[in-house]
């Protein structure tokens, strides 16, 4: 997964 604007893992 990649980093989203919230700083979390998009894959999560």
From Swiss-Prot:
Source domain of life: Eukaryota
UniProt note on tissues of expression: Expressed by the venom gland.
A molecular function (GO) term: toxin activity
Main location: secreted
Record keywords, A-Z: Disulfide bond, Neurotoxin, Secreted, Toxin
Note: Shows similarity with the venom allergen 5 from wasps. This similarity may explain why patients with allergies to centipede venom also display allergic reaction to wasp, honey bee and/or yellow jacket venom.
Family per similarity comment: Belongs to the CRISP family. Venom allergen 5-like subfamily.
Name of the protein in its database record: Scolopendra 20466.84 Da toxin
């Amino acid at each position: 997964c990649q980093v989203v604007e919230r700083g979390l893992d998009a894959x999560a």
